[in-house]
Amino acid sequence: ITVCRPSWLYGPRDRASLPRLINAVQNRKAKIIGRGDNRLNLTYAGNEAEGCILAAEHPDAVGQAYNLSNDGIITQAEYFNKIAEAIGAKPVTRRVPYPVAQRAAFLMELTGHMFGRKKPPLVTRYAVWLMGRKCFFSCEKARQQLNWQPTVSYDEGIRRSIAWCRENGLA
């Protein structure tokens, strides 16, 4: 058995988190949680797939576990603003403290359940947790043992993801 551990995946065919984030940025409803300087560990889905294929085919990968994530550092504020730039929206500058965001998400989830809404709320507690945490996983082992390199940058991955969402009427 070989284990590939993705960090937070994004890319085409994401029908959940990215379309909601794109729409929130476009409609000026997105807020940076906390200071926005926390590092996100995002992985473009195509980069993850390439790493998994390499791990599946490499004879020395049996019994190993690999973290797979994009190159470089991207903070929450940078991620939001790369999306804003890619869709031609204004930068996201409004902020909300983490505890306030958690409580607001809880209330949005609760209201949705109470009124039987089919669509998920704009923000969930899980989304707040993902966006608000500080996170870094080294993928050096995958680089060394599998000769894996992420081939799609943050900018290109965001561009492709937004294009797919638009083509499919999700943003």
Question: Where in the sequence are the language-model features?
Answer:
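Amphipathic terminal alpha-helices
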Residues: 137, 141-144, 149, 153-171
